[in-house]
């Protein structure tokens, strides 16, 4: 009999579907802390699937999965969708959205004391400093 390793968080009804199909599962219930880690891992999995989507319909399906995981993370953390929307709108009003498609390749800052120099240097993996 073929056995496949899943080793991942699944939607609530998936295990029942397997049992109804006569499959034998090895499962366990995640602790609250482990569930949050698993949800974050699931978010990465679903984001990868968004990236791999090749049709409009599959993109919609994968975006719905991302939204479901985001909603589960928020619920787990005691955050409401209204909380998220309020912060999203505030950030959009202050920083803008992504509709213009601006992609910054590099930024040269003429002043060492600029607050952005310190900001970038605090995250060298994210913002590597380019030597000329």
Which ranges hold each PLM region?
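Flexible "arm" and connector segments at domain edges
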Residues: 1-132
